[in-house]
Structure formats: structure tokens, C-alpha cells
Amino acid sequence: MDLPGPIHDFLLVFLGSGLILGGLGVVLRINPIYSAFSLGLVLVCISLFYILTNYHFVATAKLLIYVGAINVLILFVVMFMNSSEYYKDFNPWTIGNGLTSLVCTSILVSLISTILDTSWYGIIWTTRSNQIIEQDLIGNSQQIGIHLATDFFLPFEFISIILLVALIGAIDVTLQ
């Protein structure tokens, strides 16, 4: 999206704060329904980030797949479970949670220090698909495939990893 600088910066800060608050809501909420709504906020903010960077196809796919299907499925599963018995005797701070918080905080600090120390100007992420194949010689479905393999490779891989984690989590919930 071609926006003026101050508006673009404001939207980045607004979406980033919504993403952070939604992520904290997913982790810190005791009620799983509120946690699922916070997850929906996180997914919508991520889709809006993709719209700001002119990746409209990935944003639409993320909204349809994650918010429209997976988050609604999570809400249905949570509502069908008797969730009041799970968080009635909930103690949020145990030794395991403290250790997990310490590990996650150290990973976050190392990621932030790595991001700040990296020179991002010399990094070329992907090659443009119009340099590989002439776009007028191929159809729309082939263009989508080429874009997924070149321009949207990293987001596509991140989506597949998130789907794998969701599948493992569903299996874990089913076996308990």
C-alpha cells in the first residue's frame, strides 16, 4: 500500500502494538474463549501487515484460512468442552512456568540483539518472478505457483510450520 510516511509509520506502530497485546492475551488469558479471540486479533494484525507490504494474496489467504477456519474451529472446540473445570483450580505461577518464562525471555533478548546487530540493507530476500519467466506466457494458476515459490516463499513456509504446530496441538489435546 502506497501511503505517506507518517501514516505508514503510525499504522505499523498501531498494528505492532495490537499484535503484542493480542499475543499477550493469547498467553495470559485463563479463559480459553478469550484466548481464542486474542488469537483472532493476532491473525488479523498479521494479515494487515501483509496488506501494508503489498502482499494482498498472502493477506487474503491468511484471513480466510486462519481467522475464517482455524480460529473458528478452535472456538467451536473450546465451547463444546466443559472449560470451567479446567481453569477453576488454576495456579498460573509454578516452577515450570517460571522456567519457561526465563527461557522465552532469554530467546527474545537474543533475537532482539541479533536483529539490532544485523545490517539489513545488503540482504536480498528473493528474486522477482518476472525476471524468471515472462508473465504473458503463463496462466493465472501458474503465476500464483511462481509467486508462492519465489516472492512468498518465507511466508508460505511459516504458514506450513504453524499448521504443523496446530496439528500437533490438536493431537495432544485429543490424547489427553
Swiss-Prot record:
Annotated transmembrane regions: 7-27, 32-52, 61-81, 93-115, 151-171
Keyword Plastid: yes
EC identifiers of the protein: 7.1.1.-
Domain of life: Eukaryota
Keywords from the named record: Chloroplast, Membrane, NAD, NADP, Plastid, Plastoquinone, Quinone, Thylakoid, Translocase, Transmembrane, Transmembrane helix, Transport
Catalytic activities: a plastoquinone + NADH + (n+1) H(+)(in) = a plastoquinol + NAD(+) + n H(+)(out); a plastoquinone + NADPH + (n+1) H(+)(in) = a plastoquinol + NADP(+) + n H(+)(out)
Topology within the bilayer: Multi-pass membrane protein
Disulfide partners: none
Record has Membrane as a keyword: yes
Annotated GO MF terms: NADH dehydrogenase (ubiquinone) activity; quinone binding
Any Pfam family: Oxidored_q3
A GO cellular-component term linked to this record: chloroplast thylakoid membrane
Subcellular location: Plastid, Chloroplast thylakoid membrane
Similarity annotation: Belongs to the complex I subunit 6 family.
Protein function: NDH shuttles electrons from NAD(P)H:plastoquinone, via FMN and iron-sulfur (Fe-S) centers, to quinones in the photosynthetic chain and possibly in a chloroplast respiratory chain. The immediate electron acceptor for the enzyme in this species is believed to be plastoquinone. Couples the redox reaction to proton translocation, and thus conserves the redox energy in a proton gradient.
SUBUNIT field: NDH is composed of at least 16 different subunits, 5 of which are encoded in the nucleus.
Protein name: NAD(P)H-quinone oxidoreductase subunit 6, chloroplastic
